[in-house]
Amino acid sequence: MKKIHYTDRYLLNPYHPVTVFVIGAGGTGSQVATGLARMSVALQALGHPGLHVTVFDPDTVTEANIGRQLFSGSELGLSKAAALVTRINRFFGFSWEAKGQRYPLKASADREEPTLANIIVTCTDNIRSRMNLWRFLKKHREHTSNNERSPIYWMDFGNARTTGQVLIGNIRGKILQPVSNEYLPVPRMNVITEEVRYSTIKEKDSGPSCSLAEALQKQDLFINSILAVSYTHLRAHET
């Protein structure tokens, strides 16, 4: 029988906008956040509360970002997260949030109510950030309550020059699945750090960080947007 995972029922009919953290506002993150904005509008048209997104990125817009990422010359020197979210909010009339810092927040691990969201989306180009994130998230695997701070899924983007992958896994230990005579429901999907042996990957190979010309030699101009479209297409079919 074909294996299938049914989306957590809570996300299909929540009493609040589904909370999403987008970590990284670069080539992929800027495309993903824009796609999520369009998805939120579509969900609201169908009677769903939509999405509330917070974008995290400590970097500022540089000349190397213009062209490969969704930034313009007028945004040079601005926080990537703030520039991206401000543009989305103005266009769609949202009140999404921008954080010019890394996630997880340093204080989160020690706070009684850590900063969490229903869906965590990572769009970073380094391994260490993924490992640090998982050390934080796995502490919340047994989180069973349903509210805007309940962590349920982690989706990770990764790409090389002309290829990439999008992998979604459970933060929550197990997700209740319906009985099916046609499929084999899977209550738990591995996250990226459980699927990939990062100890075998060299950090220098995890993504480009250079001028636009050099970046285009290492990474196809449209690989980020291809991955972002794949993600939003997947999420749309889940909801």
Summary of predicted features, one role per range:
Residues 11, 39-50, 137-149:
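Alpha-helix termini
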Residues 79-117, 124-128:
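A structured beta-alpha segment of the ubiquitous adenosine-cofactor-binding alpha/beta core
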